[in-house]
Amino acid sequence: MSLPFQPSLFGAGNPAADKMYSTLRRCQLDDESWVDVAPAWLSGADTLFEELAGSAAWDQRERWIHGRHVIEPRLTCGWTVGTSPPPLDDLATLLSQRYGVAFDSIWANYYRDGRDSVAWHGDRVRFSLQRPLVAIVSLGSRRRFGLRPRGGGAGRWFTLDGGDLLVMGGRSQHDWEHTVPKAAHGGPRISITYRHSRESVARPAPGTTD
């Protein structure tokens, strides 16, 4: 089966994460917010993309926004850890061990092409946790991922390829917003997002700081 996007160099084969996080770099957004990025963290990312694209129970949600119904420009699917496909549960375990929190929910967004997107927002987990960690594994086509401070100011942009890992930590959900904008020639992409529901003190993740 041919993939609907340019295959990545290490995209074939069974999904396997880099347990050493050898490519991880930390970007300090401000004194209390940070982002970790680990390029090519997951090998076999194209295999996992195909599996999820063909078997997950994708749904297109409709939401009430500013007094009108809006159809989300993407497909979504969610699991609790322990009920998701085995590769996703395995990644949850690795990330939990690394960051010292119990990731217990998984949410996937399927951007079918460059017209699908997600607007600027902070994850709702910020309403229940002081310093939530949100981990994202990117599959499929390359897309831009942006962050901007809520009070205004310069933002930060990252380009995520299939197999890349991005983790937002500190007060990033409270003080920053993030987005995946439309892309004129964007191909299909799936993002796998891991969240935790209980407060925990995350261990500092070793890595080179920008």
Task: Identify the residue ranges that each predicted region occupies.
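Non-heme Fe(II) oxygenase metal-center motifs and adjacent flexible, charged/small-residue loops
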Residues: 1-210
